[in-house]
Amino acid sequence: MLLPAEIESKSLIPALRAILAKDLAKKHNIREDEISQMLGVTQAAVSNYIRGIRGDPKLIEKLLEEKQVASMITEITDNLASDNAYTPLSLSKFIGLCNYIKSSLLICDIHHNLESDIDEVVCKECENM
C-alpha cells in the first residue's frame, strides 16, 4: 500500500517539476543551470525533465488538462521567472498546488495507476484528508 506522500514524491512532484522546467526553459528562456537552482535539483535532472526522461508524460498531460492545475502551474512558473529564484511565495504556491491535487482527488487517479488492487475502504480515506 502506497501512502499519499509516497505517491507525491514518486510520481506527482517529478511530473510537476518537469512541467515547470519545460515552461521556464521554453516560455521564459531560462538556462538549465538556473532552472536547477530554482527547483533545487541538479542540472542533469532539469535536462531529463525537459527531454521527457523524468516525469510521467501521461500524468503530465492529465495534470495540464485540469484548468485549475494549469493555472496554478503558470502562476508558479511566472513567479519563479520574475524572481529568478525559489522564494517562500513560490514554495507556498507549490505546496498549495500539491494540496489542491490531493483535495480534488486527482491524486487518486495516480494511485490507481500505481496500484490496481486498492481496497475501496482504504481508498475512501483520502476524501477525509
Q: Across the structure, where does each feature detected by a protein language model lie?
A:
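Short Lys/Arg-enriched helix C-cap and helix-to-coil transition segments
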Residues: 57-74
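Short, Lys/Arg-enriched anionic-surface-contact patches
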Residues: 1-17
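Short, amphipathic alpha-helical "recognition" segments used to contact nucleic acids or chromatin
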Residues: 13-30
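Short alpha-helical "recognition helix" segments of helix-turn-helix
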Residues: 31-37
